[in-house]
Amino acid sequence: MPSCDDTASSDTDCQSQVSSTAHLHSYRSNGLVEPPSKRRLTTTNETSLSSAGATTFQIESPGSISAITTNNSTTSAGDSNNSNSFSDQHSRHPRTPNAMNSPTHTPISDIEEDPIQQLPLPSPSASPIQSDTENEHVTTPDSLQGKANLDSIENVMSNEPTTQSELVDLVTKLSGFLSEANQNHLVFKLLQKTTRPTLSTFNNLINNSLKRDILSNVPFEVTMKILSYLDYKTLLSVAQVCKKWFDIINNPDTWIKLLKRDKLITDDAVIKYELQYPDQLLREWSTLPEINSAQVLYKKRKIIVNRWMDPKFKPHRISVSGHGNKVVTCLQHDDEKVVTGVDDKCISIYSTQTGQLMKVLEGHEGGVWALKYTGNTLVTGSTDRTVRVWNMKTGQCTHIFRGHTSTIRCLDIIHPAVIGKNQDGEDIVFPEYPLLITGSRDHNIHVWKLPVVDDSQDYIETFEGEFDNPYLIAVLSGHTQSVRSISGYGNIIISGSYDSTVRVWDLLDDGHCTHVLQGHLDRVYSTAIDFHSKTCFSGSMDSNINVWNFETGELKKVLVGHASLVGLLDLVDDVLVSAAADATLRIWDAKTGELRSKLKGHGAAITCFEHDGLRVVSGSEKMLKLWNVEKGTFARDLLSDVTGGIWQVRFDYKRCVAAVQRIINEDEGETFIEILDFSQPLLQ
């Protein structure tokens, strides 16, 4: 420690230094140290604080630093009434945010003399508890003992503060030598001496610093990822927290992703179509104009799904009688029309909105057993061994394809699709134009170029044989019995036959049969294809469902459980649903083959069904039932007054269309087309 002669100092300074040195060892034994002896506090003018009495610091305990005032040769420690002591002067320092944040260079001797109000503060569990006596200190296991700590403190206190700013710096530096508990205690002590307005300011600052806006402080991509795990109810609650969160959640991308995740809409093209007319969407389904149209679309779809699942909700119903006692063999519908084929040669087109019969297409000479349309082009296959192409708008038959020698039992339309990438990373699209695939009881499969119908065409293009038909692309031969089912995508055709085999055909290889999949013990009635996973499924009279890799021909799995003919399969995304003559349906995980649910409730063989990943609608004798796919449970009966069979059923997100039979007497029945609309009323 430097001597009194090292620097210019007063006699009182030297005296204070001697006093300090005398007590140094005793304080060090307690882990405390007295400040350096040469602490002469002066002002910027010639008036010195030592004129009233020299003052030095000493640390009395880990939680307390008091001042020692020396007057001539007399030293008085801890005098609470001494107006020159630092503790008293500091307590009278004006405590305002400006004073705290922007220290001035006001001399220490110019501190204001305004008394302050001592305010009791609550003591949270994380804060030190105020002791009963003012001088009681917090004891902690850590100690200031050690030459390094003592020397550091002496170095900090070697420069005397001459301004308010320097004093604040000194206190800040000294507080760094305290333990965490004692630092908390020091803050608590200072807050006790703080005015109410300043406490209010501190409260606001602390509250703001403790708030962490997770959504706003992370990259937008991370925010969207976080939101993707929330359901719509939680999102709506979060949106009410603040305007910033509302703006984030009101982003259309948030709700488009939610539409897909909740399987309300999974096709981007459908979402784009639905959002084409946002004004109409907002007008019909929202009362809040500031909500984005994607959120309103989610609301619309969610309300409609909930109506489906609510047994108390009664959909708008239209019943149409129009086929006598004939069997409806095939059915397809959209928002404008319902198209039915029956076993009496006719094809009927009804209005979906009103149920009115709009057109009857005549020309086939036998029952219609297969139909499918795309756009305005309808294709039908009949027991008369012909395929007909129709313009539905005009009702005109535009083409007749001949070549099959027996009933056309199944057909499919393959649209252009991306099937891979070339060497340059560009999409490979196949086919170039829509293809029509027809399967017949003559064992063969025909591949046709689908004609584009023209409203101005008023004649029928008829081709008597295979060789003079420019639309015929290939004849796929190989099955030895009736072709019962066809599923196609891109360049691949999967066919199931009564010969108990499944065949894989590659149109990029001139329609060559790449694999004959053998494994079933009886007739194959149904097929499904998942092109991207190179997987196909087949259902058979042997009661099994076989899962194949159509690229390698490998039998991957056999799904067992049904007790009779598996006549129907439907694959949507990763959900495979099977329906059998044992009166049950089963829901399978298409990737793993795991059985998710067994749907029991029908009293007879399942004659028709469809699913969309959320709902299954199934029909059997006298029953039309709705099931929840996710839960694997029965939801409701859609019709309760059917007295005969359910011939066909199809549905979209808002309507269910079924062809049903009502028994009039023992020998007579009547077929009806039932249209159930769950989108009415628009708002409820």
Swiss-Prot record:
Q: Which InterPro entries match?
A: Cdc4_D, F-box-like_dom_sf, F-box_dom, G-protein_beta_WD-40_rep, WD40/YVTN_repeat-like_dom_sf, WD40_repeat_CS, WD40_repeat_dom_sf, WD40_rpt
Does the record's keyword annotation contain Cell cycle?
yes
- Give the top-rank taxon of the lineage listed in the UniProt record for this protein: Eukaryota
Q: Where is the signal peptide?
A: none
Where do the WD repeats start and stop? Answer: 322-351, 363-391, 403-431, 442-468, 478-506, 519-549, 561-589
Q: Where is the composition biased (Polar residues)?
A: 18-29, 42-63, 78-88, 98-107
* Swiss-Prot/TrEMBL keywords: Cell cycle, Cell division, Mitosis, Repeat, Sporulation, WD repeat
User: Where is the sequence biased in composition, kind Low complexity?
Assistant: 1-17, 64-77, 116-131
Q: What does this protein do?
A: This protein is essential for initiation of DNA replication and separation of the spindle pole bodies to form the poles of the mitotic spindle. It also plays a role in bud development, fusion of zygotic nuclei after conjugation and various aspects of sporulation. Required for HTA1-HTB1 locus transcription activation.
Protein name (Swiss-Prot/TrEMBL)? Cell division control protein 4
Source organism of the structure: Candida albicans (Yeast)
